């Protein structure tokens, strides 16, 4: 390989914890151009395949035309690179920041070396498009006269709204929160995705004709029947926002929060007053225990540290993953390897050790005499294969209990599905996983003219999957309205 992989440089952990801004210094344009040259333009580009292997995606679910725009970056044709990128992805400004880069995990270069830095090429393309004016608003020339309501302004709802508006339908997006963006706005901290990036795109969508209504909770503030009367079609894109709880003794202790509420309050206070209103969960000088080893748990680690937590511990039920691919996890499968994310890096820098405790779960929340949380009892787990089902099952290890000091606990244990009142308001059926039920591979619900998309449809997932769902749902809605669809979704 003529050129070595180069990526953006992260600010030193001890410096970046002093602020809540993005903290990567990206490559200059010429160096980024050379990174495009590393792409081999494979005859079978696994990077854009988006196929499921062993229940996990390999390659980009959006089927981004990765080899094409990598080559266009290398040849310096930035505008055409942007055009090819936007053909399959409505929001590269989001995915180039928060996607785990499924494309890179499936890159052929990664077989015997370092994969192409596709995610950073994507970032360079979209940011160059904004600086050069390529990303300006392009309102549809013709309107169909059809009206569509999209309920929820997360990545899936926004993707559906964007495509349906491009088709010429009049789209109104309803958001129950005070700001547009859903998960992007309040579920992802500012240091991963600065909120002005979301606002920048929303303002373009407004110029293109999309209407946004915030602070309106459909099913409560406005009846579902009114929307069904006022609009030709309704798209439910409300996410999977029902958090999984930890029902251990002492759960009623003061100081236990769901991670999603913790992160939302933090971002809202940051945007409203730069934390001067004090309307966030204060972790300064406190021992914080985070239950959950995923991305949300990591975001809680980074956020707690920025507020001056005395200590941060992250509890993970699963065993620690290997540092390199195991023999039974070959390319191009998603690599099940140990990842140390930005929050954990910061914890190591501040406290001198990795915050994670593996193969453990909470046994009890311990309260003081006033009902305040003062400690957490955890227990070690062992994992064994059930001979009857072949599935792994966990067992507590007797005598392995441990007490952790904790004034704050943040539960980041995933989500159980959508808020039931929304489904009830429209009368749509739910499946056994409490997601809205559709015919497999389709987006029409059990109620006429009501469609569903995103996490509300497939369950908790990645932003890139949400965008794909939104695009496919838009195609289904358009076909329902017009009898055919000329929307290109992949």
What residues fall within each predicted segment?
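Immediate flanking context of iron-sulfur cluster ligation sites
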Residues: 24-54, 78-102
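Glycine-rich dinucleotide-binding loop and its adjacent helix/turn
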Residues: 124-142, 200-220, 243-307, 430-442, ...
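FAD-site-proximal beta/loop scaffold in flavoenzymes
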Residues: 254-285, 384-460
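Beta1-alpha1 glycine-rich phosphate/pyrophosphate-binding loop at the start
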Residues: 2-9, 13-25, 34-37, 61-75, ...
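Feature captures the FAD/FMN-dependent oxidoreductase FAD-binding
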Residues: 80, 142, 147-151, 199-249, ...
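A conserved FAD-binding loop/helix module that cradles the flavin
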Residues: 297-300, 307, 453-487
């Amino acid at each position: 390989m003529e050129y070595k992989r180069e990526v953006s440089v992260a600010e030193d952990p001890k410096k970046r914890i002093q602020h809540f801004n993005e903290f990567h210094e990206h490559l200059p344009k010429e160096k980024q151009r050379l990174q495009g040259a590393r792409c081999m333009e494979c005859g079978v580009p696994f990077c854009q395949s988006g196929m499921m292997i062993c229940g996990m995606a390999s390659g980009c679910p959006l089927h981004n035309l990765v080899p094409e725009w990598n080559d266009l970056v290398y040849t310096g044709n930035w505008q055409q690179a942007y055009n090819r990128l936007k053909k399959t992805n409505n929001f590269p400004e989001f995915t180039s920041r928060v996607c785990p880069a499924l494309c890179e995990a499936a890159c052929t270069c990664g077989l015997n070396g370092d994969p192409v830095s596709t995610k950073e090429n994507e970032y360079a393309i979209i940011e160059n498009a904004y600086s050069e004016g390529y990303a300006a608003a392009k309102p549809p020339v013709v309107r169909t006269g059809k009206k569509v309501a999209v309920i929820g302004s997360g990545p899936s709802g926004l993707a559906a709204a964007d495509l349906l508006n491009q088709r010429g339908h009049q789209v109104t997006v309803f958001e129950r929160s005070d700001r547009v963006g859903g998960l992007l706005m309040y579920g992802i901290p500012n240091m991963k995705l600065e909120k002005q990036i979301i606002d920048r795109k929303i303002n373009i969508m407004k110029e293109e004709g999309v209407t946004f209504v915030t602070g309106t909770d459909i099913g409560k503030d406005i009846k579902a029947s009114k929307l069904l009367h006022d609009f030709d079609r309704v798209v439910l894109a409300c996410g999977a926002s029902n958090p999984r709880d930890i029902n251990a003794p002492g759960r009623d202790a003061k100081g236990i929060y769901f991670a999603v509420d913790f992160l939302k309050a933090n971002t809202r206070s940051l945007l409203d007053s730069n934390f001067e209103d004090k309307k966030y969960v204060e972790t300064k000088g406190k021992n914080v225990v985070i239950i959950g080893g995923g991305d949300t748990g990591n975001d809680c680690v980074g956020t707690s540290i920025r507020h001056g937590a005395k200590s941060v511990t992250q509890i993970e039920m699963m065993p620690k993953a290997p540092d390199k691919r195991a023999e039974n996890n070959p390319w191009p499968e998603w690599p099940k390897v140990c990842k140390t994310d930005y929050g954990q890096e910061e914890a190591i820098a501040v406290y001198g050790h990795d915050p994670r405790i593996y193969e453990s779960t909470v046994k009890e929340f311990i309260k003081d005499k006033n009902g305040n949380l003062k400690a957490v009892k955890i227990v070690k787990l062992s994992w064994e294969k059930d001979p009857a089902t072949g599935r792994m099952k966990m067992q507590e290890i007797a005598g392995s209990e441990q007490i952790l000091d904790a004034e704050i606990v943040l539960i980041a244990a995933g989500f159980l599905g959508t808020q039931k009142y929304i489904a009830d308001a429209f009368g749509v059926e739910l499946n056994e996983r409490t997601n809205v039920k559709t015919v497999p591979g389709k987006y029409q619900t059990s109620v006429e003219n009501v469609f569903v998309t995103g996490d509300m449809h497939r369950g908790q997932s990645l932003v890139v999957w949400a965008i794909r769902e939104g695009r496919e749902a838009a195609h289904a809605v358009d076909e329902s309205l017009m009898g055919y669809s000329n929307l290109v979704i992949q």
